[in-house]
Amino acid sequence: MPRLVVAAAIVDSLDNPTQLLCAARSYPPELAGKFELPGGKIDRDEAPLQALHREIREEMNTAIRVGAQVMTEEGTWWPILQGRTMGVWLAELAPDAPAPTLNGSHSEFRWTPLDKVDTLDWIGCDLGIAMAVARTSGFEPADR
């Protein structure tokens, strides 16, 4: 059975989101430069939210405050690469957390207006999630 994956849709404010923090992959070569939501695999005996906080610390050197879970229209986790499924939560940077810093997993972090998330070069499965985040926040990407 494939491992489960978690990701954070980090917005500028859980109360009034207008921007999404998008992360460009550093590797593997076929995904380098493509954007994704930060996160990663759930370790054995680890709860999903524990994994989410750990992954954000490891990938971004920061901390988050977690909000509502973002589900598919069917109310399930999101299907992603290699037959895995991903749980996604809205989040914002924790009040006293340092700004995210690059540490090798990503080549760039970019705050993107929610109505423009579809203008980035996303890993295919993450584009639909980013657009769902935008729509649930009251924005309608052009879906170019």
Where are these regions (language model features)?
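Nudix hydrolase/Nudix homology domain
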Residues: A32, T101-R144
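Conserved N-terminal beta-strand and adjoining loop/helix that marks the start
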Residues: M1-L20, K41
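Short, charged/polar surface micro-motifs in flexible loops or helix N-caps
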Residues: V11-N16, P28-P29, D43-R44, A91-P98
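Conserved Nudix-box catalytic region and its N-terminal flanking loop in Nudix hydrolases
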Residues: P17-T62
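A generic fold-level signal
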Residues: M1-R3, D15, E30, L81-G83, ...
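Structural detector for helix-capping/boundary residues
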Residues: G40, R54, G67, T112-D115, ...
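Active-site-adjacent beta-strand/loop module that shapes the phosphate/pyrophosphate-binding cleft
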Residues: R3-L4, A63, A68, E73-A99, ...
